[in-house]
């Protein structure tokens, strides 16, 4: 079975406090990708932080309040939310940090005894996409894990490219590198 992981396509990462033009540019590609999967094959992560985010370890390293639980910035982009209609409620994962061990557990349950194929898209390539791709590879060492670069963006184009290089070293397949819509 093949699964799609949609990573953190939230307002704060697209148009909010950590938004970038690159994140906005990938939106049509991500919507297109979502539509190629059955809802049962899709898992969705959402970065989720408390009101005191700036006092946390992550907040001290990245002092920009974002994805505060219950805020507009925490919500999925409305077009993404619409495209994800029909995805089972238990496939949505609020995660308090970059990678989600809960995602790996849910994928194990969904895959059963199969060796799943896993594709990741979303934001930010160098933090949450990278972390979850490596978690998936560690959980399923015999699985093909891939990232569609045309459906990802990072803080800068350079950090995106660095993350893709790091994932390649971990035997994560990178598709559509160089075809990112924000490179045009």
Language-model segments: residues:
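Histidine-anchored nucleotide/phosphate-binding helix
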Residues: 30-34, 128-140
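Active-site catalytic pocket residues across diverse enzymes, especially alpha/beta-hydrolases
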Residues: 84, 107, 111, 139-140
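Alpha-helical scaffold elements lining the catalytic groove of polysaccharide deacetylases
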Residues: 94-95, 99-112
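Flexible, glycine-rich phosphate/dinucleotide-binding loops
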Residues: 51, 99, 127, 154
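A short glycine-rich beta-strand->turn/loop micro-motif centered on a GG-aromatic cluster
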Residues: 119-126, 143-157, 177
């Amino acid at each position: 079975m093949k699964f799609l992981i949609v990573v953190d396509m939230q307002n704060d990462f697209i148009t909010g406090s950590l938004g970038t033009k690159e994140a906005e540019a990938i939106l049509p590609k991500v919507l297109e990708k979502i539509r190629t999967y059955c809802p049962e094959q899709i898992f969705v992560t959402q970065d989720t932080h408390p009101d005191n985010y700036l006092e946390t370890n992550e907040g001290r390293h990245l002092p920009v309040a974002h994805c505060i639980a219950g805020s507009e910035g925490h919500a999925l982009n409305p077009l993404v939310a619409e495209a994800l209609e029909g995805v089972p409620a238990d496939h949505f994962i609020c995660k308090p940090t970059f990678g989600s061990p809960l995602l790996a557990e849910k994928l194990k349950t969904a895959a059963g005894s199969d060796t799943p194929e896993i594709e990741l898209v979303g934001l930010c390539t160098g933090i949450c996409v990278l972390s979850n791709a490596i978690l998936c590879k560690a959980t399923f060492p015999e699985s093909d894990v891939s990232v569609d670069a045309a459906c990802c963006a990072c803080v800068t184009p350079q950090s995106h490219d660095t993350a893709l290089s790091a994932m390649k070293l971990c035997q994560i397949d990178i598709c559509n590198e160089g075809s990112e819509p924000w490179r045009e």
